[in-house]
């Protein structure tokens, strides 16, 4: 059951939800608020991941990377997977609504709808699916942000959204390159299958890395939505740029030599850079 929910993605979403709540000002959250926030978010995220697997179960059988997932691998029936998807999604929405408010619940539902009903079918139709997936992947920051008292119109929330959305370009372009043959054979329309030289994937990774750092720097100088010129702003800027540089360098190396080795380095650095930047942003907001 846990494998059905894509636990690595759920973990990443929970980390970003915590960071966004801390940046918004988590003093308003009690321990029980945190509990409901984590449970509700995990259930909705898990439901979205499960729904994605249910939708793509036939295609997943054609990819070695995904053929052993619970449904395509025959370890879980289609009916059980659908039931778990529906029950966890509904439960998560209700928990967020009752435990943290209507806005966090609505953001969670919107995330689910975009990921499942827009992003998932787009994967076999257009390479623009990555952009839609980036939006769906970044929206959960507003679950934590609004649960902690922030609003959907505040600059810090949108800079967090920008960091998460832009980070997904180098991260998923690396994956798309490494599994480009499997994606093509399964019928997925990815940037690396549409443009197999890797040039487009590389430039999207480079621009995503630059935009990620830019959003982080903006938040360093506007920690509460207002311009704050201080030593903390300068220090946060330096740390964010330093933390972001390895991912940009890896993206540039991939652009110069698009191959599996440079793609793997880009993927590995993406897994290091995101938590590092989020940590700096969270610490800056607390000063």
Swiss-Prot record:
EC annotation?
2.5.1.141
Superkingdom, according to UniProt? Answer: Bacteria
Q: Which principal EC class is assigned to this enzyme?
A: transferase
Gene Ontology MF, one:
protoheme IX farnesyltransferase activity
**InterPro entries for the chain:** Protohaem_IX_farnesylTrfase, UbiA_prenyltransferase, UbiA_prenylTrfase_CS, UbiA_sf
UniProt keyword terms in alphabetical order: Cell inner membrane, Cell membrane, Heme biosynthesis, Membrane, Transferase, Transmembrane, Transmembrane helix
UniProt record, GO biological process? heme biosynthetic process; heme O biosynthetic process
UniProt pathway annotation = Porphyrin-containing compound metabolism; heme O biosynthesis; heme O from protoheme: step 1/1
Query: CDD domains, from UniProt?
Result: PT_UbiA_Cox10
Task: Provide the primary localization.
Answer: membrane
What GO CC terms are in its UniProt record? plasma membrane
Reactions catalysed according to its record: heme b + (2E,6E)-farnesyl diphosphate + H2O = Fe(II)-heme o + diphosphate
Among Pfam families, the record links this protein to:
UbiA (PF01040)
Its membrane topology is listed as: Multi-pass membrane protein
Give me the segments passing through the membrane: 9-29, 31-51, 94-114, 132-152, 158-178, 202-222, 228-248, 267-287
Q: Where in the cell is it found?
A: Cell inner membrane
Matching Gene3D superfamilies = UbiA prenyltransferase (1.10.357.140)
Name the family: Belongs to the UbiA prenyltransferase family. Protoheme IX farnesyltransferase subfamily.
List the HAMAP family hit by this protein, alphabetically: CyoE_CtaB
Function, please? Answer: Converts heme B (protoheme IX) to heme O by substitution of the vinyl group on carbon 2 of heme B porphyrin ring with a hydroxyethyl farnesyl side group.
Q: Which NCBIfam families match?
A: cyoE_ctaB
Question: What miscellaneous comment appears in this entry?
Answer: Carbon 2 of the heme B porphyrin ring is defined according to the Fischer nomenclature.
Q: What is this protein called?
A: Protoheme IX farnesyltransferase
UniProt organism field: Rhodopirellula baltica (strain DSM 10527 / NCIMB 13988 / SH1)
């Amino acid at each position: 059951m846990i494998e059905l929910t894509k636990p690595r993605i759920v973990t990443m979403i929970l980390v970003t939800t915590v960071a966004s709540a801390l940046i918004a000002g988590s003093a308003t959250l009690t321990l029980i608020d945190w509990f409901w926030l984590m449970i509700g978010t995990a259930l909705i995220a898990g439901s979205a991941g499960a729904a994605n697997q249910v939708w793509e179960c036939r295609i997943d059988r054609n990819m070695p990377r995904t053929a052993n997932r619970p449904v395509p691998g025959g370890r879980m029936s289609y009916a059980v997977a659908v039931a778990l998807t529906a029950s966890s999604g509904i439960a998560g929405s209700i928990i967020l609504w009752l435990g943290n408010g209507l806005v966090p619940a609505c953001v969670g539902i919107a995330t689910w709808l975009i990921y499942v009903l827009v992003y998932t079918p787009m994967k076999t139709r257009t390479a623009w699916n990555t952009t839609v997936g980036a939006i769906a992947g970044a929206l959960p920051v507003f679950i934590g942000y609004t649960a902690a008292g922030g609003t959907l119109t505040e600059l810090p929330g949108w800079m967090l959204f920008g960091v998460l959305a832009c980070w997904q370009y180098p991260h998923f372009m690396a994956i798309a390159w490494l599994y480009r043959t499997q994606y093509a054979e399964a019928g997925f329309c990815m940037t690396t299958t549409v443009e197999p030289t890797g040039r487009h994937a590389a430039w999207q990774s480079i621009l995503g890395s630059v935009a990620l750092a830019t959003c982080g720097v903006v938040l360093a100088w506007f920690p509460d939505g207002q311009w704050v010129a201080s030593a903390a702003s300068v220090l946060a800027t330096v740390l964010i740029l330093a933390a972001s540089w390895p991912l940009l360098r890896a993206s540039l190396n991939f652009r110069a030599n698009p191959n599996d080795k440079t793609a793997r380095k880009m993927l590995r650095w993406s897994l290091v850079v995101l938590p590092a930047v989020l940590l700096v942003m969270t610490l800056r907001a607390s000063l």
